[in-house]
Regions:
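N-terminal helical capping/dimerization or prosegment-like subdomains
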Residues: 2-88, 280-287
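Short glycine/serine- and small hydrophobic-enriched flexible loop segments
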Residues: 27, 124-131, 217-223
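Short helix-capping segments at alpha-helix termini
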Residues: 52, 132-136, 164-165
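A structural signal for short hydrophobic beta-strand segments in well-ordered beta-sheet cores
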Residues: 57, 67, 100-102, 265-268
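Active-site metal-coordination/substrate-binding segment of hydrolases
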Residues: 75-142
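Acidic, glycine-rich active-site loops and adjacent beta-strand->loop/helix elements
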Residues: 82-84, 140, 144-152, 176-179, ...
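Midchain, well-structured core segments that form catalytic/ion-binding scaffolds
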Residues: 158-289
């Protein structure tokens, strides 16, 4: 029998832990935790779980920290990645990114939203579920702080599934959603595009082969993909094709549920300038979309 939820009691319990969750989040923020450098924040999370009385806490071979509440054989997992991107130019920050500066409304710092805030919520949610008898019979709650998401998205759970042998019945991701509940995730693909040219003197561009211009055309085409249709005149229908029963008869309803995909250019690199004071090896701009 499903236990009827007392939402007022749940809200009251969450409010009673507000100060501790705030302290915990600020503690996590204080530990720089870029991908492959999560050791300090893993230790911080492990200590917090142990202090809250988790039934089991462990760190696997990849570095993921896992805490378990309950004694069932089936698992409901709550995931937060605990690595962050770098801080970039610190001069662009209004406050120390590792201080966890706090106002009445926000906690400010690297990882506060993406995604250590989710880790703080999940860690205390599992405690509340156990204290309030909300863990379903036959289940246990697994709270996971996963590593290397920013650089190797998906590898953390591949390790948990294949190496740790953990196969949850259900997974909740605590990625930020502006407070909404999202019921699906489309996933992503990264594509690298290389173009080549020939450098030349800046006063004689006609003597070279400008790779920047080539890449500019590609970037414009990638941007246009976000507005493409799926009629016969459209050469590339990928972003909307999956939504059309004509092209995706078995799964178009699921695709429509998740919505249209997006496409963007994220990074550009080059090996040498397109125009230089003297000839140099051919430039090779690359872009990741």
């Amino acid at each position: 029998m499903t236990k009827e939820l007392d939402f007022d009691a749940i809200k009251a319990a969450a409010e009673s832990h507000r100060a501790d969750m705030t302290r915990f989040l600020r503690a996590m923020i204080s530990h720089p935790s870029e991908s492959c450098e999560e050791g300090e924040v893993v230790a911080c999370i492990k200590a917090e779980m142990e202090s809250l009385g988790y039934d089991e806490v462990r760190v696997d071979g990849l570095g993921n920290v896992m805490g378990f509440m309950g004694e069932g054989d089936k698992i409901i997992a709550i995931d937060s990645h605990i690595d962050t991107v770098g801080i970039g130019n610190i001069e662009n920050w209004d406050a120390d990114p590792y201080e966890g500066y706090e106002t009445d409304e926000i906690i400010y710092g690297r990882g506060g939203s993406d995604q250590e805030g989710g880790m703080a919520s999940a860690t205390y949610a599992a405690k509340m579920m156990k204290d309030m008898g909300l863990i379903p019979e036959g289940y246990k709650i697994m709270v996971v702080g996963t590593v290397q998401e920013e650089d190797c998205d998906g590898m953390c759970w591949q390790y948990i599934y294949n190496k740790d042998g953990i196969k949850p019945e259900f997974v909740i991701s605590t990625e930020p959603t502006d407070g909404g509940i999202y019921r699906g995730h489309r996933g992503r693909m990264e594509i690298r595009v290389d173009v080549h040219g020939t450098s030349c003197h800046g006063s004689a561009p006609d003597r070279g082969d400008n790779a920047i211009y080539k890449m500019a055309d590609i970037i414009a085409d990638v941007r246009a993909l976000n507005n493409n249709g799926c009629d016969e005149s459209t050469d590339i229908k990928g972003l909307v094709k999956m939504l059309d029963p004509k092209y995706n008869p078995e799964h178009y309803e699921d695709a429509r549920f998740l919505g249209r995909g997006t496409c963007t250019v994220s990074q550009i690199f080059y090996t040498s300038p397109a125009a230089a004071p003297w000839p140099t090896p051919a430039p090779s701009p690359s872009t990741v979309v």
